[in-house]
Amino acid sequence: MKIDVLTLFPEMFQSPFEESIFKRATDNNLVRLEIYNFRDFAHDKHHAVDDSPYGGGAGMLLKPEPLFEAVEDVLREDPTPAPIILLSPQGRSFNQEVARELAKHERLIIICGHYEGFDERVREHLATDEISIGDFVLTGGELAAMVVIDAVSRLIPGVLGSGESSQDDSHSNGLLEHPHYTRPPVFRGWGIPDVLLSGNHAQINRWRRKESLRRTLKRRPDMFEKIPLSKTDRKLVDEILAEENAQG
């Protein structure tokens, strides 16, 4: 996958993507990240990319010309089709389902906002998608872009090195992940569930599924309501509810 990012702060993307899993992905040509400073497409002597809003009001808006020219230049350089994603608090909510959707594309173009927002013509006539990572305010779209890039890249075959890794992540199947334990088996008097030491993989898988259901039910009931439960899942949920009731 190729990911083109348009930003006013290209330096912000250097360190996070030169480490760990993403670096291995780029070294293995699984992901290619290209960063563009759209200030380079502002042609006045001050290279201004923002201006005050018509009608008055606080803050400055990003002008349409530099962004349109930047995207057009990127597409001239490589005409591979791509969704043009605007990162904005007005966009659709980003989640694992959206990450899976984006991971199917051969290429993404991501626009990072700044200041008070965009001239509306960017939203209406340039962007093909608009995404928000949450109901809070950030200084710019760069951190949001990093979140999207990281979540999407993990889903590209070969990036994690194991097909099971991304499938087992929290949210990947609609459930929060089950608890994990490693050595030592007892730490400061705290042990681990006996089933994990049993060697019985069927029982271990059952325990993991049950604890995934339990954790999602308790911590994210909004997610739990959307999960299609099998007969086995329903039986496990009945056990969970009985155990919770017994504990008071």
From Swiss-Prot:
Keywords: Cytoplasm, Methyltransferase, S-adenosyl-L-methionine, Transferase, tRNA processing. It is found in: Cytoplasm. It catalyses: guanosine(37) in tRNA + S-adenosyl-L-methionine = N(1)-methylguanosine(37) in tRNA + S-adenosyl-L-homocysteine + H(+). The keyword Cytoplasm applies. Pfam families: tRNA_m1G_MT. GO terms for cellular component: cytosol. Its EC number is 2.1.1.228. S-adenosyl-L-methionine binds at G113, I133, G134, D135, F136, V137, L138. GO terms for molecular function: tRNA (guanine(37)-N1)-methyltransferase activity. One of its GO terms (biological process) is tRNA N1-guanine methylation. NCBIfam families: PRK00026.1, trmD. Belongs to the RNA methyltransferase TrmD family. Homodimer. This is tRNA (guanine-N(1)-)-methyltransferase. The lineage of its organism: Bacteria, Bacillati, Chloroflexota, Dehalococcoidia, Dehalococcoidales.
